[in-house]
Amino acid sequence: MKDKTLRQFVLFALIVCLFPMLAYARKYPLTATPVVPGAKGYVDVGQDKNGNTEIHLKVEFLPKPGSLTPPAEHYIVWFRQQSSEPEAQGQLKVDDSLSGEFKTTTHLKNFDVSVTAESESVPKAPVGPQVLRATIQKQ
């Protein structure tokens, strides 16, 4: 009888501890544009202890920006809330295996994520072609 009660307690404790992580973690697929049709990726969205949105963007099969037509120098990650201008979040670097990762934290809950190919490392606005996109609906 004690074993059954202990198992129930442990199961309950696990559910209580894991539920918040499951409730906040969500994976959104990135949609590739015709500029990079073979690219794949996703955005893992979580929440930190302060209620901010944690973003972990992962891509694979994304060609180096210099191999695009027209060639670019950098991939830039942008966030855009509805009815506002996109804001640059930083560079997405692609390694020799055509994979890359980008991590950041934001106060935004519902927003679009896009990746563009740019000639400047710190552009004020997206000028180059969009290569990947996703819509985050965290609510």
Predicted regions and their residues:
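N-terminal targeting/export leaders
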Residues: 2-3, 23-139
